[in-house]
Structure formats: C-alpha cells, structure tokens
Amino acid sequence: AAMAAEDLDFVVHYGDYIYVSDGGTLTIDDYRGVYRRFKANPYLQELHARYPMVVMWDDGEFVNGIDRTMEPVRFAAARQAWFEFMPVVRPADDPERVHRAFEWGSLVDFTMLDVRSRRDRAIESNDPTTLLPTTDTALPSGAAIFDPDRTCLGPDQKAWLKDRLVTGDFTWRHIGHGYPFVALRLEDYDTPEARADPPEGFHVNGGKFLSTEQWDGYWAERRELIVQASPRRLGP
C-alpha cells in the first residue's frame, strides 16, 4: 500500500528474491519449482504488474554463501532458472553476463554488479587468517583480508566497472549490489597506539569485522575501486 502511494518509475531488487539454503534444491526443475512457489504470492504478482524491476542475484538464488567454486552443474541450473523467471534481457554478445548498466541522460549512471558468482571464497570472520572452509592453508596475520589478488568481482567485471567509473559525465553514479561497501568493524586494531608500536601481524586498517563475506573480506579490491572513483561524483 505504501509503494502504491508513491510515484515510482521502477523497483530495484538486489537479490535473495528466493532463498535456497538446503541441499535438496539441485536441478533446474528444483529451482523452477522454488520460483513458482514464490511467484504465486499475490502481493508479488501485483508488484510485477505495477512496476518494471531492475534485478540482480545474491546467494539466495543459488545456495547460501556461493562463490566461483560452486558445483558447476547446480550453478548452471540455478542461473538458468533465474534467467527464465526474472525480468532480465540476456546480452547477445555474452549471454551469461549479468552485470550491466543503465543511463538516464547525464543525470545518473546506474550499474548493477554480481558480487557472488565470480568472487573468491569467503574468509572466516572470527579468524581472518584463514579461508573457508577451515581446512584450507592458514595465511599469516590476516593476510587473506588484505591480499591484493583476492577478488569479489572477478577480473572481467572489475575492469568493466573501473572503465565505467571514469567514462561519461554524470551528476550521479549508482553502484548497485547486495553488500554494504563501508567497513563494518566490531573491533578496530588500527589504533594510534598500534601504529606507534606495531604488534606482530599489525596491518593498517586491521580489525575484527562483522562479516568478511562482504567487502571487508576483499579489502584491496575495494580500495582499488575507491581510488578509481575518487575524482568522480558518486551518489549516496
């Protein structure tokens, strides 16, 4: 009712349109069944009838916590179901690409990013020296968080975004995805005292983070994007 009272041009959805968190949704028919159940909701049907929607997937459309190492057959099934049930036009030159951009004159450059399917494996929040699962080789002193080779976007998508950030003259630039971009520390290890007498393993910007599954687990890449965008004007 509140949305109906607004003069909306479109709705943006950043993912988790469905949420698969079990081990039983495996095939294309399984994923299609989940979408059919969700789309039977009359309120959701009314939303789609009233407004166009700009969408991106998160992990809920696949299985909780996905990354580029997801089992390929299951990933392909989930991806195909998403394309079938969501309002997305597949690009002719690259039918598997989902990151894309929209422009409204010189007012706004509106990008949508895939921060799930191309990313490196997440880091364990409580132990930033190791990768998930914990059987992986430990990295010293939180090095995994600040590893410059770790990527959330993947090389092709990152290059595409960096180019867009310096292309065109827009009043606003919107970068859409399902993660908080700011650092969310539970404990800040980067203090004046630590800088004056660095303990073993000290790292500038170090801390205990709320979730290193998000951008706090891909610190170097986030910094690279901030530096690229710094001369430009970004929206809130």
Residues covered by each model-derived region:
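Long, structured stretches of catalytic cores involved in phosphate-ester chemistry, encompassing
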Residues: 1-236
